[in-house]
Design a protein with these regions (language model features):
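Conserved ABC ATPase signature
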Residues: 58-62, 66
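Conserved signature/switch motifs of ABC ATPase nucleotide-binding domains
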Residues: 78
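Helix N-cap at the start of a conserved alpha-helix in ABC-type nucleotide-binding domains
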Residues: 94-96
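A short, surface-exposed alpha-helical micro-motif characterized by mixed small hydrophobic
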Residues: 124-126
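Catalytic Walker B motif of ABC-type/P-loop ATPase nucleotide-binding domains
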Residues: 83-86
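H-loop/switch region of ABC-family ATPase nucleotide-binding domains
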Residues: 118-119
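Conserved ABC ATPase "signature" region
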Residues: 36-54
Length: 167
């Protein structure tokens, strides 16, 4: 069952000046989750994001990729109904990007609706079911992903997919 209706993960991970454990479990504490359940979920999630060895160090000491995985896990640990992501893998290495994409796919399969902004066409192809194409803050098209990449209805979307500059 969802503890939080909506969660948001920023492009630049936001860390509390606390340990990895405290950052990860902060939303559970706010939801007044029992301590035993907090410990169980923390153990599960630090394993999933490969941070078990550093669970008690300050989160601010992590690499950018580790911080982003922690920020995502902190959002997902609550089993949100809706997850909003702003360029969650921008400037991350390929390995970390794939790890994050796997977490997102698993969460979507388990019922979380994910809305993600991205400029990464490959990532959109791998993850999206539906594409909302925005240009200068205005919605230009909404299509199922398979159709969007085959037959985009927006001229700007067509240019973007082709790698052209969209003005």
């Amino acid at each position: 069952e969802s503890m939080a209706k909506q969660m948001f993960v920023f492009q630049s991970p936001v860390m509390l000046r606390r340990s990895v454990f405290e950052n990860l479990t902060y939303p559970l504490t706010l939801c007044k989750t029992p301590k035993a359940e907090i410990n169980r979920l923390a153990d599960e999630w630090v394993s999933r994001i490969s941070l078990k060895e550093v669970i008690h160090i300050a989160a601010t000491r992590l690499s950018r990729g580790e911080k982003q995985k922690l920020a995502l896990a902190r959002a997902l640990i609550t089993k949100p109904e809706m997850l909003f992501l702003d360029e969650p893998t921008a400037s991350l290495d390929g390995k970390t990007t794939l790890e994050i994409e796997k977490l997102l796919q698993n969460s979507a399969e388990n019922g979380t609706t994910i809305m993600m902004s991205t400029h990464d066409i490959g990532q959109a192809k791998r993850l999206a079911k539906n594409i909302l194409f925005l240009n200068k803050g205005k919605l230009e098209s909404t299509q199922p992903a398979q159709i969007f990449f085959r037959e985009p209805i927006s001229n700007n979307a067509r240019k973007f997919i082709a790698g052209e500059i969209v003005e």
